[in-house]
Amino acid sequence: VLLLAVPGSGKTTVLVTRLGYMLCCCGISPDAILTMTYTKAATKEMQKRFVRLFGQDCPQVPEIRTINGVSSKIIDFYTRTHGSGSAFTVVENEGELAKIVSDLYRELCGEFATQSVIKELRKGIAYVKNMMLGKEDLGELDTGFDQFPDLYAQYNLALRQRRWMDYDDQMIYAKTILENYPDILAHFQDAFPYICVDEAQDTSKIQHAI
């Protein structure tokens, strides 16, 4: 089912109501439903709405995660079942990533980057990863910085040297696991026969692929 409607028209309420219908009327186990939304704040809001509407009839709230929460779940399962822990740490401090971009910009052009420049460059980096672009596509991006391909390559190298990954790398890692380990893909397909996505219009190419 694809629900298209203007902002503020009640799409999320419809999705929460559908979850209640699936659990209370159809008898579907909450463990069989994976519900995804765009932000952590949105997951909490959906859980609150569900409890308000169906708390007495459906005391067990279905799993609601962000796409990065799903990616983390995939990586954790891979670690447990294949005995290979992730050697990389997801960087939660955005300032650390911004500093890497700032330092690289200064090295490449000999100038200090303004906050707006850093923001635009980080948006470009995220866009490349979310749209799964190749090296040949980097020069065509309108980032306002001619040396963006070099900065992008050095940014990823800097993360690898620190054994770090950003949230976009986390999705790439999860997608790679699903593509290369059919048993893990089958596990999640069997575990969650029902998938509900809120704010689907904000889904990027790699998020859709996962």
State the predicted function of each range.
Residues P59-P62, R80-M165:
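ATP-hydrolysis module of ASCE/P-loop NTPase motor domains
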Residues Y21-C25, R49-L53, F77-T81, A98, ...:
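Active-site catalytic microenvironments for nucleophilic, acid-base chemistry
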Residues V1-S84, A186:
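P-loop NTPase Walker
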Residues V1-G10, L34, E63, E96, ...:
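Conserved helicase NTPase motor core
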Residues V70, E120-G124, Y173-A174, A191:
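Short acidic/histidine-centered micro-motifs embedded in hydrophobic/aromatic stretches
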